[in-house]
Curated annotation (Swiss-Prot):
<comment type="pathway">
    <text>Amino-acid degradation; L-arginine degradation.</text>
</comment>
<dbReference type="InterPro" id="IPR029035">
    <property type="entry name" value="DHS-like_NAD/FAD-binding_dom"/>
</dbReference>
<protein>
    <recommendedName>
        <fullName>Probable 2-ketoarginine decarboxylase AruI</fullName>
        <ecNumber>4.1.1.75</ecNumber>
    </recommendedName>
</protein>
<dbReference type="InterPro" id="IPR000399">
    <property type="entry name" value="TPP-bd_CS"/>
</dbReference>
<dbReference type="GO" id="GO:0003984">
    <property type="term" value="F:acetolactate synthase activity"/>
</dbReference>
<dbReference type="InterPro" id="IPR011766">
    <property type="entry name" value="TPP_enzyme_TPP-bd"/>
</dbReference>
<dbReference type="GO" id="GO:0009097">
    <property type="term" value="P:isoleucine biosynthetic process"/>
</dbReference>
<comment type="similarity">
    <text>Belongs to the TPP enzyme family.</text>
</comment>
<dbReference type="Pfam" id="PF02775">
    <property type="entry name" value="TPP_enzyme_C"/>
</dbReference>
<dbReference type="Pfam" id="PF02776">
    <property type="entry name" value="TPP_enzyme_N"/>
</dbReference>
<dbReference type="InterPro" id="IPR045229">
    <property type="entry name" value="TPP_enz"/>
</dbReference>
<dbReference type="GO" id="GO:0000287">
    <property type="term" value="F:magnesium ion binding"/>
</dbReference>
<dbReference type="Pfam" id="PF00205">
    <property type="entry name" value="TPP_enzyme_M"/>
</dbReference>
<dbReference type="InterPro" id="IPR012000">
    <property type="entry name" value="Thiamin_PyroP_enz_cen_dom"/>
</dbReference>
<feature type="binding site">
    <location>
        <position position="76"/>
    </location>
    <ligand>
        <name>thiamine diphosphate</name>
    </ligand>
</feature>
<dbReference type="GO" id="GO:0019545">
    <property type="term" value="P:arginine catabolic process to succinate"/>
</dbReference>
<dbReference type="GO" id="GO:0047435">
    <property type="term" value="F:5-guanidino-2-oxopentanoate decarboxylase activity"/>
</dbReference>
Amino acid sequence: MGARALRRERRLRWSPNWTRILPMQPQKTLTAGQALVRLLANYGVDTVFGIPGVHTLELYRGLPGSGIRHVLTRHEQGAGFMADGYARVSGKPGVCFVITGPGVTNVATAIGQAYADSVPLLVISSVNHSASLGKGWGCLHETQDQRAMTAPITAFSALALSPEQLPELIARAYAVFDSERPRPVHISIPLDVLAAPVAHDWSAAVARRPGRGVPCSEALRAAAERLAAARRPMLIAGGGALAAGEALAALSERLAAPLFTSVAGKGLLPPDAPLNAGASLCVAPGWEMIAEADLVLAVGTEMADTDFWRERLPLSGELIRVDIDPRKFNDFYPSAVALRGDARQTLEALLVRLPQEARDSAPAAARVARLRAEIRAAHAPLQALHQAILDRIAAALPADAFVSTDMTQLAYTGNYAFASRAPRSWLHPTGYGTLGYGLPAGIGAKLGAPQRPGLVLVGDGGFLYTAQELATASEELDSPLVVLLWNNDALGQIRDDMLGLDIEPVGVLPRNPDFALLGRAYGCAVRQPQDLDELERDLRAGFGQSGVTLIELRHACAR
């Protein structure tokens, strides 16, 4: 059997009564599944992630000729994480196709991660026939209420009961992505609706009219007056400010205000910018410095404890907040002035209202320089080891590369100690904090920005959650993706936490596989450096060759 025939054979799935589904003949009528795919293409979707199944065949009928690339993942959770990475790097919504029931429950962790980190995902799934919903008939993949399963982790979860509802639901999803706090949307489509012919072709009915806007003049004036009067202003910016980098830099310079970021906001200022305080509000030197501010302007950040590693920041002055989500204005930190609107437009409006002459930034720059020195000096032995590795990564990393990270101790240190060179360049599962994110998110990021070299930082524990997606990477990628596997043969953070609480370590010392052999089995180039000099050379080599390079760095070799 030839390769093309083999791929065709693999695409076949089985029906609920175990009758083989044969390839359909060309049809003159347009099904809702076909029309939906065409509609997505007209919204600018160029990539979808998923695994075809018997319940989603009508979606896949629409893919050939649509201009949309389908990426076959090895697990629906991988599809969700890839869509997340794609969205974070490209700025466009990531799209998944998943089947009824187990496809939805498998992708749910990735949906939860995207919800926590305000990442736009569009998850389209099948669901059983309309007549069976809620009846408990024992249909294949049946759930009691599929829509309700994802409702708590989405901006909205909807059930389309007719083909004509689909363009309205897609328009509503893009209204969330464009005009609200971007979060996942899940649309379930019954099998009979997917296969139904459309009465009229709505596949070109794109309704996309972003409307974020700016706060009222009175609120802007009040904020500008407070900023102008502040003696020690400081800024905090998060993922909601990724499109406001120029305005943030101008405001920081005008006010001589140090700029802190959340993990999602890393890279908003260049690493060598004198007022770039980095994502350092999770360590004591950062806490001490922010306490000195008499006014803090927080832009596009929920100021969550997952960014600060403590319940509350020690703010002693007033707080002004800029956010698209009004629920953030009085969460834990009551706002003196609340500015609801688009981050970039709001900051530009503030700049117009502030004195045009920049303040003397020398004292603030000196304070930031001291902060950076204090962070390095405060490293415990493990963090000092991480810093040495991160320094080698920085030396080898191409200028336009991104880094996708997992929940691993090396990345925890990197969250505050690694200087990102640009926005959308450090991907981390901050809020939900799931393991297994780094590799598939890195693959999705590569597909969202194929011209950018990619690096994945993952620990041995998290790697095994989604290691099968190396098969996807080897099949789909022809430009450099380097996977740096930090292998300490342990669930290191949990082991350390147990020891810190005087708990005898249980379940934290797994017997790992031969990672080099595993990587080769998936078609990766494999390197195992014995020291940090070799690590830097291997990183450079990986970025210089096409495809996937797996670098296993054992803890003992990093000293």
